[in-house]
Amino acid sequence: MTKPAVQKNGLHPRNRHRDRYDFPTLKHSYPALIPFVTVNAYGDESVDFANPEAVKTLNQALLQHFYQIEHWEIPDGFLCPPIPGRADYIHHLADLLAEDNRAVVPREASVLDIGCGANCIYPLIGYREYGWRFTGSEINPIAMKAANQTIEANPGLNRAIRLRRQKSSTAILAGIIHKNETFDAVMCNPPFHASAEDARQGSQRKLHNLGLDKRSPLNFGGQQDELWCEGGESAFIGQMIKESAGFARQCLWFTSLVSRKENLPEIYRALEAVDAEKVRTIDMAQGQKQSRFVAWSFLDTAARTRWLQKR
């Protein structure tokens, strides 16, 4: 008898990954996954999430099966993102845009992804789900090369996704948004940790949660610019907020993930300091993990509606 699908608590209603992974279907669709699938102590098929190669292959299977991405590779040591959570950001952002567009998610919206990474995951999902056009910024040349290889290896992506190199280590939006250029939304998954030591301790906590020895050579992935920056998440978002004021009429919504809830008061103060017209906090959840993104606009409701009607 086929087991009933068990839904993952809290994921967006349109998220394709609300049910537990259907490994029989994924193995049939993407045979390279077969060697990594085993039966766990509960009698369910799964993969070893402590094995970076297994996690990457699972992502390849999910991208191929759900999003028709036939070729996706990331270099060793780069972040391998959990796709369900990344998809949730896209779907909640779509709802935010729909609020100003008579409850209709705009097609072919123009979106800027700050720090798209080697995985380029937000542009891939956003384009396949909603036909959005993406500009991805990236400071790491190796990551940018890998993302470009994915774009060129999959037919049609190069007409929807373009990448721009961020040449300044201190800028986020500056140098990426061109004069007279507009975006319907800006999205960002900022570096989480405040130092390399914080990042190392975060990896050790993951090892502990997986029941592994701290001396394990496990590589969870993530380059310096992906994992940490001076001052951590709060400082990065604060800089993004300051820069956003200079592009107040070029972007409808600015958004950023906020991993640490305790950073919200400081973020709200920064938004008040730049006179943001509208601020929203969108809560998200995946099982026991709680997350959110903060969105802000310098346009009032009427101006935001006019913006989308003129697209």
Curated annotation (Swiss-Prot):
This is Ribosomal RNA large subunit methyltransferase F. Keywords: Cytoplasm, Methyltransferase, rRNA processing, S-adenosyl-L-methionine, Transferase. The gene is rlmF. Its main location: cytoplasm. It is found in: Cytoplasm. GO terms for biological process: rRNA base methylation. CDD domains: AdoMet_MTases (cd02440). GO terms for molecular function: 23S rRNA (adenine(1618)-N(6))-methyltransferase activity. Specifically methylates the adenine in position 1618 of 23S rRNA. Pfam families: Methyltransf_10. It comes from Pectobacterium carotovorum subsp. carotovorum (strain PC1).
